[in-house]
């Protein structure tokens, strides 16, 4: 047990000594580099860099970057597959109704675009029904709207 503790202490001491030696070496290299750099070298490098950039390069670079950014933006999909009122629809992405129109199905993926769905027609959301009430995938009569006979 004592030998294990002694080995651990020995390892810690060697690690600490190696870290101290690397710190000293890096400090020496930093001092040497700062001594080698003179005051006249720094302004010359800045002057050379500013001479290389002309005024006409910047707008071209900015224009190219904005064009590239515009290409990377998510585009709003154009509704080239949407159908108008009275046309064929299938409730799929390729044959959907435009705007607020709803597809009234007559069979399996076979329907017509209409303003709203009549009573007892197949629906998914209440907003599709004229009565604004969809229950168990069928448009239902709205009990709150009563027809008063004349």
UniProtKB/Swiss-Prot annotation:
Keyword Disulfide bond included in the entry's annotation: yes
Disulphide-bridged cysteine pairs: 116-130, 123-134, 129-139
Primary location group: secreted
Compositional bias ranges of the Acidic residues kind: 36-49
Sugar-bearing residue positions: 20, 24, 32, 36, 48, 52, 64, 110
Keywords: Disulfide bond, Glycoprotein, Knottin, Secreted, Signal
Taxonomic superkingdom: Eukaryota
Domain notes: The presence of a 'disulfide through disulfide knot' structurally defines this protein as a knottin.
The protein's name: UPF0506 protein SJCHGC02381
Originating organism: Schistosoma japonicum (Blood fluke)
Lineage of origin: Eukaryota, Metazoa, Spiralia, Lophotrochozoa, Platyhelminthes
């Amino acid at each position: 047990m004592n030998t294990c503790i002694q080995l651990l202490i020995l390892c810690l001491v060697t690690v600490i000594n190696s870290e101290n030696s690397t710190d000293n070496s890096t400090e020496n290299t930093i001092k040497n580099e700062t001594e080698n750099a003179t005051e006249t070298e720094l302004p010359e490098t800045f002057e050379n860099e500013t001479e290389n950039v002309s005024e006409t390069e910047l707008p071209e670079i900015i224009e190219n970057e904005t064009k590239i950014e515009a290409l990377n933006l998510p585009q709003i999909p154009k509704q080239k597959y949407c159908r108008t009122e009275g046309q064929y629809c299938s409730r799929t992405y390729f044959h959907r109704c435009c705007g607020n129109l709803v597809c009234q199905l007559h069979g399996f993926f076979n329907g017509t675009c209409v303003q709203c769905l009549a009573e007892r027609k197949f629906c998914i959301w209440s907003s599709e029904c004229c009565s604004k009430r969809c229950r168990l995938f069928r448009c239902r009569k709205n009990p709150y709207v009563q027809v008063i006979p004349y």
